Amino acid sequence: MNLSEYDWPCPTGITPFAHQKETAAFLAAKPKAFCFNEQGTGKTASVIWATDYLMKLKLLKRVLVICPLSIMSSAWQQDLFKFAVHRRVAVAYGSANKRKEIISGDAEYVIINFDGVQICKAEIIAGGFDLIVVDEASAYKNAQTERWKTLRDVMRHVKGLWMLTGTPAAQSPTDAYGLAKLINPQAVPTFFGQFKDMVMYPVTKFKWVPRPNAQVVVSRVLQPAIRFEKRQCIDLPDITYLYREAPMTSQQLKYYKKLKEDMLIEAAGEEVSAVNAAVKLNKLLQIACGSVYTDTKEVVDFDAGNRLQALKEVIDEASHKVLVFVPFTHTIKQISDHLTKCGISSEIINGSVPVNARTDIVKRFQEQQDPRVLIIQPQAASHGLTLTAADTVVWYAPVPSVETYLQANARIDRPGQKNTMTVVHIMGSAVEAKLYTLLRNNVYSHEELVKLYKQELSETT
């Protein structure tokens, strides 16, 4: 579709990249389509421009965006405010009644998370949506799940569906089946077993491996589709910075609030030093991450399911290897255990790993398929190491040093890096968002730390 007369609304100083314009034009011409552009290429903006263009032509009235909880506000809502400020936008999150009320309202764009679709199925069907956009669409790869069946039922009442993921069928060629059944059902057999036979064959009673032509079949059934890899987008900046929200669980919030109340009592009438502010803020960050050290050096674990899920989503969407920087020792173990449960290979580099073992881990990370993820304590490996097999850095929590932050990011930004890089910041509290801003702006000073600590105590959780 020709968007030559479209005005491409943008904030001052921002212009669409060529690949974003091409992606928007492709999607605008297709009622149902895939967008497989890699993480960090600006898929969200392309979708917003395409839908806004169709709305201006009166071909579209309402859009439902289905995405992970971690990017409802930090990606979709913020980008809609940037690139479609003239449109009505609402986030359907909270109680079931609140979500249903928002869906039944007059917002032109409604953003909801995966689980919310099942809760609000009837309201979505009756909501007058012309198009559904599914971000991180791999969540719908399994056609046997209730999540998939709910979307299938909804799509019987909605004309358009765009599915976005940077890593289609990354784990197995059979992952393409659920996606294809939603966009292009005629391309795949009626039954999953038939498709599995097309793309895999058994080598033992319990082990199946991909057929030599599996990727060709996957590419054929996942159509119509557009894909840009970061290395193809020559106008992209070398490093793209992204943010993911991971709301604290009810257990975390309870103890976070209690700790703030205790700090408020302690701070009454006292002069706050930078050292004291750093220690106290560190405790709050520990709770947000899922493990806190008591004054007696014991470790108390919290339910950090939202944060772990946000991390897994980033890893799943990454096309190459990933570095995860984690300031707290015990949280590193939590993450390692979680990735193991998810079938994601990882290794740990922290202060307790001997030099010889560290050298071996780095060599395998750079040269072999596994490990896919390195979980790193920033203070232990922010200098010197070359880790260019990764093109994505994840900050599980902010660190108290601009130098450490910059040096850690530089582990992937070294000679030998062949891809455009992405740095993702995970946050679950306002103080983390402010700390990341200080790090990005290179202004992490003692004065700013004390100021931030006082601000945090003055705000109710």
Regions inferred by a protein language model and the residue ranges of each:
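Conserved pre-motif I regulatory segment
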Residues: 2-36
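Conserved helix-turn-beta segment of the N-terminal RecA-like "Helicase ATP-binding" lobe
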Residues: 71-95, 183-186
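A conserved SF2-helicase RecA2
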Residues: 400-461
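Short basic/glycine-enriched coil/helix segment immediately N-terminal to the Walker B
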Residues: 27-31, 104-107, 120-130, 154-156
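Conserved Helicase C-terminal RecA-like lobe
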Residues: 1-4, 14, 28-29, 40-42, ...
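SF2 helicase motor core recognition
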Residues: 118-122, 171-173, 332-336, 358-362, ...
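Conserved helicase motor
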Residues: 70, 90-99, 114-119, 141-145, ...
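Conserved P-loop NTPase motor "coupling/switch" region that bridges the ATPase
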Residues: 60, 89, 131, 139, ...
